[in-house]
């Protein structure tokens, strides 16, 4: 496509991305992340009594991918709920998990988030994209990718998994949560072609690229900065604290410019709102979990730290969560 490494880095902060192998679905990637999370938590898979699975790129139209993860983990029969808040899935999943645990319906919840974006990208020659071969692509393919450059340079594939457990530790866990959904701005980023309204089996629609994400980048950036800043302030106000009392703000990794603008709005230094988008791109539902895992293993999160999770995704959905680790 007509772009350059400099153009991509300047506008997104992305230096590299990773793509799943052909035929590798979110069930497989999610199960691998889940295995690591289970080992890290020091639990047995049989202790899991509920699964939440977030993706916008499921293995199949139906069933959802949650039961597929359970099967791979050897715990078929555990209830699995797939959620669809796209890039905003983490704070929504945290709210659902907290409710299940508080009600006594579950004690150990596995939350898996995974997305693979091959079907959402304007590339036809994936061997070239993955670097398996070097060859000139047809002019038509070059122009098609360039026309969808706004989304083609952003998304990467990835999976994350988190174990949520009941605790008796005073003041630990989810403290405050603020969630919003606004269908009036669904057109900021969406895929027109789907199922009931614009059938996925219509060849004319497919030829028009209606199966690819359509994004109003400027509108989305402004909405993200405004919503995330407002939501962060809302949960802090509810808790009676200011930004200086939050140890880390862990935000969805959509675009470095968004997170920089949120940091400026909240008067945060860069280290208070860490980023890994340069290494992975936007892995949609998986970004917060991946960043959380890295921060933990780097020793940047300790027991008792106060975290603020922030995310906005297609819908529009947005959420902020104050969480005592």
Provide a role label for each language-model segment.
Residues 94-184, 291-325:
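Conserved beta-strand-centric core segments of catalytic alpha/beta enzyme folds
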